[in-house]
Amino acid sequence: MGVSRPPSTPASKIERTPMSTPTPGGSTRVKEEKIFVTVRVRPLSKKELALKDQVAWECDDNQTILYKGPPQDRAAPTSYTFDKVFGPASQTEVVYEEGAKDVAMSALTGINATIFAYGQTSSGKTFTMRGVTESAVNDIYRHIENTPERDFIIKISAMEIYNEIVKDLLRPESTNLRLLDDPEKGTIVEKLEEEIAKDSQHLRHLISICEEQRQVGETALNDTSSRSHQIIRLTVESRLREVSGCVKSFVANLNFVDLAGSERAAQTHAVGARLKEGCHINRSLLTLTTVIRKLSSDKRSGHIPYRDSKLTRILQLSLGGNARTAIICTMSPAQTHVEQSRNTLFFATCAKEVTNNAKVNMVVSDKQLVKHLQMEVARLEAELRTPDRASSSEIIIMERDRKIRQMEKEMEELKKQRDNAQLKLEELQKKMGDNQPGWNPFDSPQRTRKCLTYSGSLQPSNKMKIRSSIRQSATAPFMLKHEIRKLEQLQQQLEVEANRAIEVLHKEVECHKHGNQDAAETIAKLQAEIRGMQSVRSDRDVDMITDEGNGSDLKEEISRLHMQDNDIAKLEAKLENVQRSIDRLVMSLPNVGTQCNETTPKSNRAKKKKRMLLPLGVSNINRPNLIRAPCSPLSSSRPLEPEVENRAPEGDTVSHEGSERATPTKSEDTGDVSSRDETPRYRRSSSVNMKKMQKMFQNAAEENVRNIRAYVTELKERVAKLQYQKQLLVCQVLELESNEGKTNDMEEDSEENAGSLQDGPDSWDRLFKEQMQHIIQLWDLCHVSIIHRTQFYLLFRGDRADQIYIEVEVRRLTWLQQHFAEVGDASPAAGDDSTISLASSIKALRNEREFLARRMGSRLTEEERERLFIKWQVPLEAKQRKLQLVNRLWTDPNDQAHIDESADIVARLVGFCEGGNISKEMFELNFAVPASRKPWLMGWQPISNMIREKTQLW
């Protein structure tokens, strides 16, 4: 099967691009996206329709699937949402177009892609994957025809994992292939054959060969069940036809993964080799589910068991790695497969949370890569030797412009300062000539140093000093303004720190609403005073700006400075009060003061419990931040924003009020420490005990309700059994008395009873046919044993004495139908043989049919079997023909000929014809299925046994 390969770049000469390799456009093509998950619900199969299985799942819309079956024992979700949901009427082409096409076509642009088919056995995985693969091949070659500027090479390789052994599907003679770890390619399969597809027909031929070589077997659920995992890998390489400076090509893998279905041995009845295959399949699928579940969780740092299975090891890149992945989950809507369907939906729910990191895989040959790098080095060397004058001159000009703009700004600032100084000097010279009597600047030397305005009446001896001071006053405004700004900055810092301290205290008091009232009032006063100081200061700032604009003198500046000094002193005094208020508030908080020195385990436990109950704003975590003085000089360099952020917001006061019932607050602890120590500690424990008692009472009440419901159900069943036993005893007595004829009175009574039961031959025949038809309908609805049906149908043929049996059977089936309607499809508890359900009836009927199918080999000859196969239209090439024949018996309750033939075949298989005359009231003592112990599925046999035991005791 070898095919000549065209010349291409060897694998050893290909350098794969890393995760952050830039694209020609300059950006990295690393794409993060989640797995695209779709769910396809198949229609009911022929076997499920023959067993009258119910539909339990419906597609609400194209993204939601709903559970419509009877309620389950355990709590489970009733609706699931996915990227796409396809109902039973959807076609495979639609599934491919909306669920897998986008992922499959990404392989043509250099992105790895994988398409999974996951689901239980006989759910339609292989059917779906065949259609998806065929559609993908058509689209790939259609894209190749529409892209003439690129050359494409399609390579195919295929493998199957059968019993954890990797085999090459293109080489049937291949043995167990080893898995190797490659640092660049990941996990590879050693000696795996890879063929180059010449065209689409050749590729389809190779795919068909792979499907023929796959392991297929027969199970009870599927005649052609896939017994291995199949992986068909298409490697797509493309390169430009035109030769460029650095020829790049794309390479990507497209995997079509058809998984084997999960199965239960109880349903497939697998033994021997089939059981071994099922064990390996379930083990590998369990590993796949574990990997998906761990990848879907938030914490992906833990160990992910890729190497626990060869399936997950080969597909590691497709699971959370460098690939785009689409998963098509197939499921059956039947009620009998509800648990397997839920497991499939759980897998799909986890899979849609897995994130892959897909990238474009570009490869460059070594020869052309070296040539490209040499050209790049030559270009850089040329730039270093002859720098670009234009670019360098532009940079120099921009730098000079920036410096010029900066110098212009500085010159404008200097001009403003010069103008202000000249203005101040002119005002000073003008006011020095004014006469101001009553004030002598030389009376107070300190005042002379602070004030720079002088009167006109000066002594001649001091005129020279005044002239020198005037010459020096030109630089005084700058120094004075600098000092004023320093003082203003100090005041602002103190105000900011005071406000922060007040906010901290205010929030703490808000958390303790019933706290110290004195501290709260002090804080409110301090806040009002600081706001007043800020408003006054803002007014002064406005006045200062206005006065500076109008040319105010330095005397007003100095007076304002004195007032600011007084304000700063007042502010410092107020901040001292704030510090003392902080200390008092901290000492009044719980677990502070003398309680901090308690080291007993009991107190420590109480503190821990209280700390857990209190919100974050009043916890002990933030109390050390309150003890530090926010107004101290060292605190100015320490930011307080993290401390404020760690406190509870104002909106949390409601939650704190709700927790006051369980947490002792400051209002409960008013007084000294000793009063808090004397508070009884059993209050909190009593509240906890009350909660425990309430929980115990609730659990006890629920348990009592369940016990009462079970007891009532058991009583109903016992009453029904006693009623049937009573009626059967009456039948036995009537028949014995009529046969023996002991007394005339009893004979007259029996004749009267017989007379009362009949009005005429025609009416009784008509009534018997109607009741028998009603019984047959109920047999079919309740899935009653076909052995019981045959026995009853052959024994009671319309005799007037049979009316009591007919009536008892009608009542029994009516009660059974009502019981199924009430119980639903709930499975009986372990060890409870008296509780039955519709599911248990179906299971017992299925086991009975299998029992009869096995008896056909010993009870019927080969010629009889062949005649029956032809008569019942069982195909000659069909699998399990005997079971198919038995499954067709007693399936049409409206066809009288069908019922007669079914009863005849069952009677021959069980041996009714060999027993001779059988007593009607003991009709099912000899021909019951020994495996079943449920009385209502067995018909009347257990009741008859109980009657016989009672009569022997009497």
Curated annotation (Swiss-Prot):
* A single GO cellular-component term on record: microtubule
**Binding-site positions, ATP:** 119-126
Using the UniProt annotation, give all residue ranges assigned to the region (Disordered): 1-29, 624-689, 741-762
Provide ranges: composition bias, Low complexity. Answer: 17-28, 630-639
Domain of life, per the record?
Eukaryota
Q: Give the keywords, sorted.
A: ATP-binding, Cell cycle, Cell division, Coiled coil, Microtubule, Motor protein, Nucleotide-binding
**Which GO molecular-function terms appear in the entry?**
ATP binding; microtubule binding; microtubule motor activity
Q: Which family does it belong to?
A: Belongs to the TRAFAC class myosin-kinesin ATPase superfamily. Kinesin family. KIN-7 subfamily.
Functional description taken from the UniProt entry: May be essential to promote the progression of cytokinesis during node-internode differentiation.
Protein name per UniProt: Kinesin-like protein KIN-7A
